[in-house]
């Protein structure tokens, strides 16, 4: 088992799943990319089997009042399926309210061109990185 393990963040969407991971020390978020549901299993399985992942953080859709949204039930089912597939892997949630909006603002501020911002998956990956960055900040 590796001395340092990573935290993986997931921004689950109906079309794509944005994925990010922490550095081995758990200080920074790094983008992995976007996958579909089957691709997520293929991505996570080798990392989990190698003992490289200590925790998965899933964006949880709450509105600005902290109440559940229409997507919350979908995320609950997704988390349950992750727990069945990876029973020993701890899974936590983090409020993802405005994560996509914040990710878009970050892409604009970083000088990412409009064409690059519209690239499929770019926003989902950025949102996963923001979720993970927020989670890591909360742990300090």
From Swiss-Prot:
GO terms for cellular component: cytosol. Its EC number is 3.1.-.-. The keyword Nuclease applies. Pfam families: RuvX (PF03652). Coiled coil: none annotated. Keywords: Cytoplasm, Hydrolase, Nuclease, Ribosome biogenesis. One of its GO terms (biological process) is rRNA 5'-end processing. One of its GO terms (molecular function) is nuclease activity. Could be a nuclease involved in processing of the 5'-end of pre-16S rRNA. Belongs to the YqgF nuclease family. This is Putative pre-16S rRNA nuclease.
């Amino acid at each position: 088992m590796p001395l340092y393990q990573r935290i993986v963040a997931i921004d689950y969407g109906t079309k794509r799943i944005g994925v990010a991971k922490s550095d081995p020390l758990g200080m920074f978020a790094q983008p992995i990319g976007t996958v579909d549901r089957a691709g997520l299993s293929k991505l996570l399985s080798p990392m989990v089997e190698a003992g490289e992942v200590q925790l998965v953080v899933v964006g949880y859709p709450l509105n600005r009042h902290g109440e559940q949204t229409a997507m919350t039930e979908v995320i609950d089912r997704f988390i349950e399926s992750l727990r069945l597939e990876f029973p020993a892997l701890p899974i936590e949630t983090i409020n993802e309210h405005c994560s996509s909006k914040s990710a878009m603002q970050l892409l604009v501020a970083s000088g990412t061109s409009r064409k690059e911002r519209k690239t499929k998956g770019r926003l989902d990956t950025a949102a996963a990185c923001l979720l993970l960055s927020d989670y890591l900040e909360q742990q300090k």
